[in-house]
């Protein structure tokens, strides 16, 4: 049976869009262990917890962002399936916008750094193709609902 985890692809809208019109920035966290990969906050589902509760709890634990500081974007949910440490893993992601552009990020011991990045930079740091695809799909979804 696959390990199950859930998380939020957190973004903010730039106050002044950059020249390349990259008005959306994604939050990525750098893991403290292993290959120090960059991902949005995520974690394993606890017994009795539903998937979205897990995503919100993990975001609070890993980045210090509480549920009340976020707006979950309706209509976007992605399931990533891959192998991690020789075991199948499923990760469910939702899109969430921070309500405050300057929200304080407080990292847990599981992460050593964070960055707000435009789509292209975020995809360069996200080493796994499934994660890159989820970021691209999230960006495309956000652009489609703004139009």
From Swiss-Prot:
Cellular component terms, GO, for this chain's entry? mitochondrial matrix
Coiled coil residues, start to end: none
Query: Which parts of the sequence carry N-acetylalanine?
Result: 2
Q: Which Gene Ontology biological process is one annotated for this entry? A: nucleobase-containing compound metabolic process
Quote the CDD domains the UniProt record gives.
NUDIX_Ap4A_Nudt2
Keywords, comma-separated and alphabetical: Acetylation, Disease variant, GTP-binding, Hydrolase, Intellectual disability, Neuropathy, Nucleotide-binding
Q: Which cofactor does it need?
A: a divalent metal cation
Catalytic activity reads: P(1),P(4)-bis(5'-guanosyl) tetraphosphate + H2O = GMP + GTP + 2 H(+); a 5'-end CoA-ribonucleoside in mRNA + H2O = a 5'-end phospho-adenosine-phospho-ribonucleoside in mRNA + (R)-4'-phosphopantetheine + 2 H(+); a 5'-end FAD-phospho-ribonucleoside in mRNA + H2O = a 5'-end phospho-adenosine-phospho-ribonucleoside in mRNA + FMN + 2 H(+)
How many and how are cofactors bound here? Divalent metal ions.
Q: What is its EC number?
A: 3.6.1.17
Q: List the disulfide bonds.
A: none
Q: Give the Gene Ontology MF terms in alphabetical order.
A: bis(5'-nucleosyl)-tetraphosphatase (asymmetrical) activity; bis(5'-nucleosyl)-tetraphosphatase (symmetrical) activity; GTP binding
Could you confirm whether the keyword Hydrolase appears in this record?
A: yes
Q: Which InterPro entries match?
A: NUDIX_hydrolase-like_dom_sf, NUDIX_hydrolase_CS, NUDIX_hydrolase_dom, Nudix_hydrolase_domain, Tetra_PHTase
**What sort of enzyme, by top EC class, is this?**
hydrolase
Nudix box, short sequence motif: residues:
43-64
Q: Which residues form the Nudix hydrolase domain?
A: 1-139
Pfam families under this entry? NUDIX (PF00293)
Family (UniProt): Belongs to the Nudix hydrolase family.
Purpose: Catalyzes the asymmetric hydrolysis of diadenosine 5',5'''-P1,P4-tetraphosphate (Ap4A) to yield AMP and ATP. Exhibits decapping activity towards FAD-capped RNAs and dpCoA-capped RNAs in vitro.
Noted disease: Intellectual developmental disorder with or without peripheral neuropathy: An autosomal recessive disorder characterized by global developmental delay appearing in infancy or early childhood, intellectual disability, and progressive sensorimotor neuropathy with associated distal weakness. Affected individuals have hypotonia and delayed walking with an unsteady gait and frequent falls. Additional features may include dysarthria and subtle facial dysmorpism.
State the name under which the record lists this protein.
Answer: Bis(5'-nucleosyl)-tetraphosphatase [asymmetrical]
- Species source reads Homo sapiens (Human)
Q: Which gene encodes it?
A: NUDT2
């Amino acid at each position: 049976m696959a390990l199950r985890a859930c998380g939020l692809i957190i973004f903010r809208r730039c106050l002044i869009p950059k020249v390349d019109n990259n008005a959306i920035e994604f939050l990525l966290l750098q893991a403290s262990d292993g290959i120090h990969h960059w991902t949005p906050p995520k974690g394993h589902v606890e017994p009795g917890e539903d998937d979205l509760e897990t995503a919100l709890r993990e975001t609070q634990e890993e980045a210090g962002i509480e549920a009340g500081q976020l707006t979950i974007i309706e209509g976007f949910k992605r399931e990533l399936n891959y192998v991690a440490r020789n075991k199948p893993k499923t990760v469910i992601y939702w899109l969430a916008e921070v309500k405050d552009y300057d929200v304080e990020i407080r990292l847990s011991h599981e992460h050593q750094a964070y960055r707000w990045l435009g789509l292209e930079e975020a995809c360069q740091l996200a080493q796994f193709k499934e994660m890159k695809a989820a970021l691209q799909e999230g960006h495309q979804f956000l652009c489609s609902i703004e139009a």
